[in-house]
Every structure is written in structure tokens, then in C-alpha cells.
Amino acid sequence: MSSLTSLTLKGALDGLEKGDFTSVELTRAHIDAIEAARGLNAFLLETPEQALSMAAASDARRALDAARPLDGIPLGIKDLFCTQGVRTTAASKILEPFVPQYESTVTSQLWRDGAVMLGKLNLDEFAMGSSNETSAYGPVVNPWRKAGSNQALTPGGSSGGSAAAVAADLCLGATATDTGGSIRQPAAFTGTVGIKPTYGRCSRWGVVAFASSLDQAGPIAKTVTDAALLLTSMSGHDPKDSTSLDVPVPDFSAFVGKSIKGLRIGVPQEYRVDGMPAEIEKLWADGIAWLKDAGCEIVEISLPHTKYALPAYYIVAPAEASSNLARYDGMRYGLRAEGSNLTEVYENTRAEGFGDEVKRRILIGTYVLSAGYYDAYYLKALKVRRRIAEDFDNAWERCDAILTPTAPSAAFGLGENSSDPIAMYLNDVFTVTTNLAGLPGLSLPAGLDANGLPLGLQIIGKPLDEGTVFSVAGVLEKAAGFTAKATKWW
């Protein structure tokens, strides 16, 4: 059955439609693959019985000619999405015993469309991290390795479990979230496709909050078409989320394969950062050449406030996190530590329940929101955020989409940057601007570095113009011809 796990999501839908195999067979093949790949630590919780039950229900619908858009497709769910009756931890000790009594909007829409849940995927604790090393349940290991090396590499973060599971053929797609690059950077590190849609395109209801004005759900998948199919199901207005946009959801997969002749593609000069590896420079140049060949006009643009994006992000995001994470006090749900009085219970619960990176961000956030520093830090960061959004507004007068690298390097070794938070934060240098401006951004694999590791290109689009992003991505995917897979060692 291993051939079933190597299918794309679209290929699996076609096979199910033709009757080449059943959803139960497809799901069983993925359950077996997950069991054999526990060394990757991609799944925090496996739900094989529930998966097979959902698959059987899917087969029954298909037999009645009542198949839904994703009927029978086995998916992994990032353990930040609440799943009714299934433990949801956000990869934190403080939520270890938490079983939600409700389903997140995004996952309920996937189940509505017939998808199958294989289990919950590992991540950085509360989605805070760029390497999946902050998880209370251990790091995820990237299925990719450097040529001739056994060194364990990071899959990126925070959606490291989602990216690793898709790259290792453990699921046909996965849900993920992106606050500063947490879909796109792991996709780049694992040779997968990931899209963060426009802020408000997918509901945040039932997704454990990190930074509410930046968080956005999206899919990680094997191909651009697969990502488009998943995003179509995940998107839509939700009255339970006050930031959800009440706009129509197109069939995003219809945009893949469209001609992009005449499109203006912006290339921001500020993204040519010092110390960027020559391989990433070359990949970017290749991407520009491929789009020129497709009939695009390449336009040099300026996003002058880019250099302030990371500092602004690492003020705004921790500030919102310190507020959001105040709810974890041991009273209503999650871990409760012992103490001789109420204050001690609060203090001990949070001290025992949160990991170091989460504590670091709560402290930073509390500091920048404090009376003496609010104006100097938080208010100033909000002004910078507005300037960054204005930079993009000005750029859209000259271009229709923007092409950049996704990350400043290929996957690095586990433990390599964990002692230096600043070095870790620099992984987000190309991705945080789209979160600050609320724009759609997609990463797709476009080449390998000298060590045989995947490298990604990022396409940034206008607000709610995921369609153009998918059209450009489809052309780049075809031109790059990226078919490499991680050599199985697990």
C-alpha cells in the first residue's frame, strides 16, 4: 500500500473517484506509514480508529454517488486546532489534559467536505518558534537529510509537524497556522507547498491564539493544486470570528494552470540581505527568469520599511501573546499546580506549564505593554506596521504579485540556533512582512542546495488575491520541475 501514500491529494481524489481503491484502504496505508515513522515525532496523537470510521463513512457516501469535495482524503491536523473530544495541547504542558468540547471552524469545514482525521500534529509550543524545538513533547525531525550526513535537521516551525508529515508521505495534506512565517518557512525547509491566505480568509475560531492580529490558518500540501483544494475548503466567513471576512470563496484550484502573461512581478530590493547564501540568490534569479519566460514583466520595487519588520513583529506578537496567554491560570482547564494560596497556584501553574520560549515572549510582551514603555515600544511598533502596509499599498500600483525567497537558508541542524534567540528570529526575515500587512503568501519548492536540501520561493499577493498567487505558483511549479523527495531513513 506504500504507493497509496505517495499519491498527491488530487491523485488520490481521482483514484477514489475511479474506484481504484477505497478511502479505508487509503487511510489504512497512511496509518501504517505513521506507525513506521514515529521517529520523526510529527504526530502528537494518532487517531486511527476515528480515521477508519470517517473513511468508512466516506466510502458509503461515494457508493451512493454523494461524494463531497475532499471525500476520503486523510489529513493531519496541527495540534493548535481544537478537535471535539480529541485532546488539543498546543504542544504545551499547560494544556496536556485539555479535551475541547467543540470543533474549530476550519476543521469542521474539512469534515463537512469529507476529509479524514489521522491525528494531531506536533508544533512549537503555542506556535512560538521557527524550528519545532520549543514543543513540550520533543522536536520534530525533518525527513530530509544533508547528502552523506545523519545529522538531524529541523523541519522549521511552528508548523514543523505539518510540514514533516506531508513531506514524509504520512498524510495527503495538513492544516497549519502562520503568525510570522509558520506555514511558509517549514514548507521551504521540507520541499512542500504552504500558503498563508489573506488575514480573515480562514476563521480563527477554535484555533488556540498566539497573536490574534497576525494568526492565520492555511494548508501545507505536496503540490500547488493540493494546497488550492485544501484552502477552498478551509476558507469562508464565520460569524464566530469578528475578523473573518464576509467575501465569496472561489475554487482556488481553478487558478492553477492559468496563463500569467502580462502580469507585473515585483522584486523588492530590500530583500537582498547581507550574508544571503549564493544558492538562494541563484534560486531567486531562476524564479525571475521562469516568470519572464512565462510572459511576465519584472519590476524592481522598494519596500523601504522592511528592515524594521522583524523588530516590530517581535514587539507586536509577544504583546498580543502576553494578553492571550493570561487565560492559562489553572482554574478552568489545563494543568493546575499545587500552592498554599491562590496567587501561588497561579504562579506555580504558569511556571510549570509554560516552556522557556513562551515565558520569554510573555515577559517581552508584558514589558512592552507596561506603563513606562508602551509608547516607546508598542505604539511605535504599531506605527511601523502601518508603514509596512503602506509600502505594499504603494508597490501594488506597480506590480500584481511579488517574488522573494521564503527563508534565508535551507534547513539547519536541531540545536544549532536554539541557544541564540536572535539567530532563530532571523529565520522570519522574509515572511513577517506579509503577516504585519495581512497579505497572502505562498511558498513552493523550487530547487535544492549543494547538500541536497530543498529551497523555497515565496509569492506575495494583493489582499484577497490568492487566485493570482496560485496562478503564479502553478507556473513556477511547472518551470522548477521539483520532484525530489526525502530519502527514507526512518
Swiss-Prot record:
The active site annotation covers: 78, 158, 182
What do the Gene Ontology cellular component annotations say? glutamyl-tRNA(Gln) amidotransferase complex
Q: Which PROSITE patterns match?
A: AMIDASES
The record's Pfam families line, in alphabetical order, gives: Amidase
Q: Which SUPFAM superfamilies match?
A: Amidase signature (AS) enzymes
Single GO MF annotation: ATP binding
Q: How does it assemble?
A: Heterotrimer of A, B and C subunits.
**What does the UniProt record say this protein does?**
Allows the formation of correctly charged Gln-tRNA(Gln) through the transamidation of misacylated Glu-tRNA(Gln) in organisms which lack glutaminyl-tRNA synthetase. The reaction takes place in the presence of glutamine and ATP through an activated gamma-phospho-Glu-tRNA(Gln).
Protein name from the UniProt record: Glutamyl-tRNA(Gln) amidotransferase subunit A
